[in-house]
Amino acid sequence: MEERCNAIDDDCDSVNYEGCGYGPGFMQVTASWDTGADVDLYVTGPLGDTLSFQRPSTPSGARVDHAGRGDCSGDMPNPQIENIRWVGERPAGGIYEVEAHYWGECITGGGPTNVTVSVAVGREIAGQYTLSLLPGERVRV
């Protein structure tokens, strides 16, 4: 099976997203969704730093390298994907909190939206989670 850029390891090689236009890192959190809605991904680290489209990088090497906008933005590759990764040094040890937020319905998206969030550590899938979000809802994964 071929990789489909959907936050699921479709080809079962324990590595997500080969050829999807965004990169892996020592740690990586990716969200994908199934409507034209704009869904935002937030990751808060043990030092209290929150990464999102509003704060796309930290001095520790974390960065948002793809922030999809669903149907809210016209000409964007992979508009239903958000990807946060840590490059360079290992991320700080501790607990990381991941949240998904159904920001808006955009032009054609709307209603309940299924969101898949995957977490990879050392380029290996550590967990995949599926949520159903309603407009305006923000949920801890």
PLM region descriptions:
Residues 1-24:
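Extracellular calcium-associated, cysteine-rich motifs in secreted modular proteins
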Residues 16-141:
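Intrinsic-disorder/low-complexity signal
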